[in-house]
């Protein structure tokens, strides 16, 4: 792959078997009963904030979506940042970040309101107008998706500033609800179910 300055850049590809094993090991850790939080959420900060783990996740996303040829990675504060940066590093492209509230230090911004698919509440996010050039190919990345409200909001925000969303990639996507607010997406892991009473968690890897 061409480097940022035109030369050649080495891309550390892993085998599909190695990636599948790595993701399977993460599932074993995530399926621990003590990770279940109120509301059926799963504690995963220790994984997505681990430099070695999140770096490998970014490389896997790059390998599995390189044909999309993104020019920018886009995520939302705050938990999407580590995975977004790791994927951006693997692709050797910039990352832009949407905020829940615009900041005056970032200049004029475009803001949208969106319906959170999990909380069913109206929320907002903003992106500096200068963050993405018109026509830029954007890969949206986030840490978790249940109904897809946040991911859909990111897509709408990117399109609002004139960018083209070429894909949506998640670390974990919940199997239910089956009908998401985003039509097409991919994930590294799938949450098939969680029982708050028994503390049973069922997370499986998306194998290649």
What is each PLM-predicted segment?
Residues 2-69:
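Active-site-facing substrate-recognition patch
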Residues 3-5, 14, 19-20, 152-208:
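PRPP-dependent phosphoribosyltransferase catalytic core
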Residues 70-77:
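Short glycine-rich phosphate-binding loop at a beta-alpha junction
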Residues 71, 136, 166:
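Conserved acidic residues
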Residues 82-91:
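Short Gly/Thr/Asp-enriched flexible loops that form oxyanion-binding sites at enzyme active sites
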Residues 92-93, 163:
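Short glycine/serine/threonine/alanine-rich loop segments
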Residues 93-139:
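Short, glycine/charge-rich flexible loops or terminal/linker lids adjacent to PRPP-binding catalytic cores
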Residues 136-160:
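Active-site/ligand-binding-proximal alpha/beta "capping" segment
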């Amino acid at each position: 792959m061409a480097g940022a300055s035109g030369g050649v850049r080495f891309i550390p590809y892993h085998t599909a078997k190695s990636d599948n094993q790595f993701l399977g090991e993460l599932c074993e850790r995530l399926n621990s009963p003590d990770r279940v939080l109120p509301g059926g959420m799963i504690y995963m900060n220790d994984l997505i904030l681990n430099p070695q783990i999140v770096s490998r996740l970014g490389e896997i996303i790059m390998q599995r979506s390189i044909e999309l040829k993104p020019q920018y990675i886009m995520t939302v504060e705050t938990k999407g940042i580590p995975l977004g940066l790791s994927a951006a590093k693997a692709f050797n492209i910039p990352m832009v970040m949407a905020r829940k509230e615009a900041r005056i230090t970032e200049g004029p911004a475009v803001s949208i309101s969106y319906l959170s698919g999990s909380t069913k509440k109206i929320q907002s996010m903003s992106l500096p107008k200068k963050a993405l050039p018109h026509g830029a190919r954007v890969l949206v990345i986030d840490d978790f998706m249940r109904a897809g409200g946040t991911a859909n909001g990111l897509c709408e925000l990117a399109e609002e500033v004139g960018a083209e969303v070429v894909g949506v990639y998640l670390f974990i996507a919940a199997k239910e609800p089956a009908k998401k607010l985003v039509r097409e997406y991919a994930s590294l892991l799938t949450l098939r179910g969680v029982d708050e009473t028994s503390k049973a968690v069922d997370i499986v890897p998306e194998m290649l």
